[in-house]
């Protein structure tokens, strides 16, 4: 594939967006979000059709395989009181051994090594935490928790009692209903600090309708982590590195994909996290999908040939983000920006609680399709 030199520049993935187009609330029911359907290559304009997510079932075939991400968002945001006075927030990310956890802190400049923090809740005994060190790679803080919260299972109990679901910073509100609405209906494996948002559109009714049509379903796990909060800062994308995220692709997923290929079905990823999980596992297998459990830091951008994924249901992503690069790898950068302009013109809602885009396998660049 011959790339336009601009494809390797971060500034080429910018686009103007009115803040009013950023969805602050989810729609109900889930499947009533709008759906931009990308026209197959070679078709006459327009470049897209407009529908609702409920209509997506008309685009799928019996024998297709949907790959969902079953991660569950932790209540990973903690509000703490600083010993010197004032409040702060911690976003708990990952273990750092012996009861220590890497956290993003706000305001970070007031969270210094040695500072004591107090975690408080109505009717609960305060819990003492301590900032141990700064983490230069992430910009976060390593925080010491009490020894009886040393492992993930124990910490999850603490987060459930004291924490809140960490909505993205562009959602300027908080409501108790987000604890349920910012989860997919099939979220079952706790570990993420952000939702795999394409899956938020899949209601129980839509999943049942797809099943009745003969569409198959399998689930991978990718715990969305620090990378989702970190903007891409490298203008030269040939040197881009991403923070790794924990992935598990089980044997039953491999078997489901093989069976899908055998019946000439299509592998459809629900969300970019499912793409990264499948493609990361295939990379570990030398280009062939295999079971996998471990960190994945795969960069997918224009020029990438997919090994597993044929089509994609995805949300609309932030300008100059790694997710925008991934979707550009499927349809081409200029074409994707034209599709985003179409969505903006037609008043689509953007980002986590926003609307969706369907990229049919016939809309994927030929050079990017699995061999």
Curated annotation (Swiss-Prot):
Pathway: tRNA modification; tRNA-queuosine biosynthesis. One of its GO terms (cellular component) is cytoplasm. The keyword Ubl conjugation does not apply. Pfam families: Queuosine_synth (PF02547). It comes from the Bacteria. It is an enzyme of class 2 (transferase). GO terms for molecular function: S-adenosylmethionine:tRNA ribosyltransferase-isomerase activity. Its main location: cytoplasm. GO terms for biological process: queuosine biosynthetic process; tRNA wobble guanine modification. HAMAP family: QueA. Monomer. This is S-adenosylmethionine:tRNA ribosyltransferase-isomerase. The lineage of its organism: Bacteria, Bacillati, Cyanobacteriota, Cyanophyceae, Synechococcales. The gene is queA.
């Amino acid at each position: 594939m011959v790339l336009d030199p601009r494809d390797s520049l971060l500034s080429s993935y910018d686009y103007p967006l009115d803040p009013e187009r950023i969805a602050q609330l989810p729609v109900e029911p889930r499947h009533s979000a709008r759906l931009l359907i990308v026209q197959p290559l070679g078709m006459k304009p327009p470049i897209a059709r407009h529908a609702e997510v409920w209509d997506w079932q008309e685009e799928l075939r019996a024998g297709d395989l949907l790959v969902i991400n079953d991660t569950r968002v932790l209540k990973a945001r903690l509000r703490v009181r600083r010993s010197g006075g004032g409040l702060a927030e911690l976003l708990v990310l990952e273990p750092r051994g012996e009861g220590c956890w890497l956290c993003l802190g706000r305001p970070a400049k007031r969270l210094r090594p040695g500072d004591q923090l107090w975690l408080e809740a109505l009717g609960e005994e305060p819990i003492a935490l301590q900032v141990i060190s700064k983490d230069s790679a992430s910009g976060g803080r390593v925080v010491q928790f009490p020894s009886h919260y040393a492992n993930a299972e124990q910490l999850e109990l603490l987060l459930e009692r004291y924490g809140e679901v960490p909505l993205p910073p562009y959602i300027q509100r908080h409501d108790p209903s987000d604890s349920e609405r910012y989860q997919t209906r099939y979220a079952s494996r706790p570990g993420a600090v952000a939702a795999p948002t394409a899956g938020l559109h899949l209601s129980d009714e839509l999943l049942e309708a797809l099943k009745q049509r003969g569409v198959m379903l399998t689930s991978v796990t990718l715990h969305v982590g620090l990378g989702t909060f970190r903007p891409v800062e490298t203008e030269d994308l040939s040197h881009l590195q991403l923070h790794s995220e924990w992935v598990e692709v089980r044997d039953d997923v491999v078997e489901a994909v093989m069976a899908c290929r055998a019946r000439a079905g299509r592998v459809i990823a629900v969300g970019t996290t499912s793409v990264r999980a499948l493609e990361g596992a295939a990379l570990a297998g030398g280009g062939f999908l295999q079971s996998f459990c471990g960190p994945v830091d795969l960069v997918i951008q224009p020029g990438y040939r997919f090994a597993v994924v044929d089509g994609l249901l995805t949300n609309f992503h932030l300008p100059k983000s790694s997710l925008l690069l991934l979707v550009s790898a499927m349809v081409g950068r200029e074409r994707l920006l034209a599709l985003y302009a179409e969505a903006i013109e037609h008043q689509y809602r953007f980002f986590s609680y926003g609307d969706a885009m369907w990229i049919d396998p016939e809309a994927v660049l030929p050079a990017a399709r699995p061999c």
